[in-house]
Design a protein with these regions (language model features):
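Phosphate/nucleotide-binding beta-alpha loop and adjacent structural elements of enzyme active sites
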Residues: 1-208
Length: 208
């Protein structure tokens, strides 16, 4: 697999996604955190070159104006978490691409710039709110350490299916938990030699 065209994904995530989907047009994506929606975005090309629609979630205030300018799909400024309707502390880093909900584990490594409260929403509720189809073609997840609890809740809800998922692990200690969670829910891991700090998974039922 090689990079081509104007793909933005830092580690070929967008190219992998569109290739797995047979370079289809009019697919559906969800991406959180979406940052400014363009720079190293895993869904920008899907929307702008392949006419996909979808949802972006990004609570960082510094990205709000850019995100609205860069993208035409649905945008939600709540933080995806495992519970909806909570207000949690959000840490906006000097490098805004590293901003995240607060946790004891990331407060030292992220380097807090400022903090403020953000409302949370589960992935299932995010999809419901924006009238997403029951089968999502591609999901990109980068939430600096909260991936496992978000996905565990999503899989337990059992309402929506996602065919392909790119989830950043950044070599965190809970990586094996994430892998096991995907395997238990009918996914197979793809291109481990290419995915770098991401895990890429496809649903077995659509990859065989």
């Amino acid at each position: 697999m090689r990079k081509a065209g104007n793909f933005q994904g830092e580690y070929l995530q967008d190219y992998w996604a569109i290739a797995e989907c047979g370079f289809k047009t009019n697919g559906y994506f969800v991406e959180f955190g979406a940052a400014n929606g363009k720079e190293i975005s895993n869904t920008y090309i899907l929307e702008n070159q392949y006419s996909w629609n979808g949802i972006l979630s990004e609570p960082a205030r510094s990205f709000k104006d850019e995100l609205l300018k860069n993208r035409k799909c649905s945008i939600d400024h709540r933080a995806v978490w495992d519970v909806s309707g909570k207000e949690l502390k959000f840490m906006e880093n000097k490098d805004a691409f590293l901003s995240s909900l607060y946790s004891k584990e990331n407060t030292n490594t992220l380097g807090e710039k400022e903090s403020y409260l953000v409302e949370t929403i589960t992935l299932t509720d995010l999809l419901k709110t924006h009238s997403a189809p029951k089968i999502i073609d591609f999901c990109s997840i980068d939430v600096e350490g909260f991936e496992y609890k978000i996905l565990k809740k999503f899989f337990s809800d059992g309402i929506y299916s996602i065919n392909h998922i790119a989830v950043e692990h950044n070599w965190r200690a809970d990586g094996n938990l994430l892998i096991d969670l995907f395997l238990e829910n009918g996914y197979t891991q793809k291109y481990m030699h290419l995915s770098q700090r991401d895990y890429w998974f496809s649903r077995i039922s659509i990859s065989t």
